[in-house]
């Protein structure tokens, strides 16, 4: 039997298991025209937490850069941060589409993902591939407005975004690939005409902080699918450390808080940063870890959304207050 015939048979069997009437997973998607619905799903328009998680590294990096810069940053600070956030949104969206293309046959075997557009046949491979390429190109259009070195940073981030789905297939550590979103720190510094290597240790500590928070969030999500991931042959740190996930999650809370303290200490931050930024991060993520420990499969997205949003807000507020306090 040819590969094409086998693929067609798998697609047919997948469709046979689908409900006759498809209901969009959120009100946001239900408002889209029917022809746009699968593309909205590919972009994860119904998963706003993902947009928060990809934008916050650039917002945090901007506040951090302003705090450690030897002089007041240029007047176009906010326009450049906006361009970086728009880049991150399109990077995330294109990455989600690419992930669905690479994982469609695995997604068909997992209850939470079997109704995604590709497994249910709502879009073809070629349509999804063109859509992913167009989405990435839109992101690069924003990067083109930044200093030239940012294009190199963007290509590095794109490489890891494309690599991610294969990390799930060939290892139990795809979250380490996701952690490379920490590259937002040097990219933002380049975008603001700062040299990351002039502040190597604070920059590395902040990179580690962003990476550890991203890894922790994804492990919390992956915990929902451990049984099905094992059956489907999908690797993750949640699968690898399934018997000590609570300990790992709490360790990541403490490790990320320690990285933030190191970044603040070496960046000459003051009391407002350690009280508001570090305290807010530690408090909210400790709450999230405890909530996940009590019930890892119920209300995870609700708790994660509120904790991440609140912790990010306090992190940035602490940096801004600290900057004003020291000026």
UniProtKB/Swiss-Prot annotation:
Pathway: Secondary metabolite biosynthesis; terpenoid biosynthesis. It is found in: Membrane. GO terms for molecular function: 4-hydroxybenzoate polyprenyltransferase activity. InterPro entries: Prenyltransferase, UbiA_prenyltransferase, UbiA_sf. It is a multi-pass membrane protein. Keywords: Magnesium, Membrane, Transferase, Transmembrane, Transmembrane helix. Gene3D superfamilies: UbiA prenyltransferase. This is Polyprenyl transferase andD. It comes from Emericella variicolor (Aspergillus stellatus). The lineage of its organism: Eukaryota, Fungi, Dikarya, Ascomycota, Pezizomycotina. The gene is andD.
């Amino acid at each position: 039997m040819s590969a094409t015939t086998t693929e067609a048979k798998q697609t047919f069997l997948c469709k046979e298991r689908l409900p006759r009437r498809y209901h969009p997973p959120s009100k946001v998607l239900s408002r889209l025209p029917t022809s746009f619905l699968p593309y909205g799903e590919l972009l994860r328009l119904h998963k706003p937490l993902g947009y928060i998680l990809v934008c916050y590294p650039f917002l945090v990096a901007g506040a951090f850069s302003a705090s450690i810069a030897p002089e007041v940053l240029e007047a176009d600070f906010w326009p450049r941060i906006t361009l970086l956030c728009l880049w991150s949104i399109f990077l995330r969206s294109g990455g989600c589409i690419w992930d669905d293309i690479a994982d469609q046959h695995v997604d068909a075997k997992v209850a939470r993902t079997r109704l995604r557009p590709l497994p249910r046949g709502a879009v073809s491979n070629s349509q999804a591939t063109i859509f992913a390429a167009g989405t990435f190109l839109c992101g690069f259009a924003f990067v083109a407005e930044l200093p030239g070195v940012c294009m190199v940073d963007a290509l590095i981030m794109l490489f890891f975004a494309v690599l991610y789905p294969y990390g799930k297939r060939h290892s139990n550590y795809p979250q380490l690939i996701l952690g490379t979103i920490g590259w937002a720190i040097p990219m933002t510094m380049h975008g603001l005409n700062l040299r990351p290597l002039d502040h190597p240790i604070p920059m590395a500590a902040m990179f580690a902080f962003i990476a550890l928070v991203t890894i922790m969030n994804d492990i919390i999500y992956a915990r929902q699918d451990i049984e099905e991931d094992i059956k489907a042959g999908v690797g993750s740190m949640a699968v690898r450390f399934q018997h000590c996930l609570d300990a790992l999650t709490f360790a990541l809370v403490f490790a990320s808080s320690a990285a933030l303290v190191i970044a603040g200490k070496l960046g000459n931050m003051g009391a407002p940063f350690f009280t508001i930024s570090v305290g807010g991060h530690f408090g909210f993520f400790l709450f999230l870890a405890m909530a996940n420990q009590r019930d890892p499969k119920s209300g995870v997205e609700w708790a994660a959304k509120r904790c991440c949003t609140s912790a990010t807000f306090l992190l940035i507020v602490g940096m801004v207050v600290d900057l004003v306090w020291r000026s």
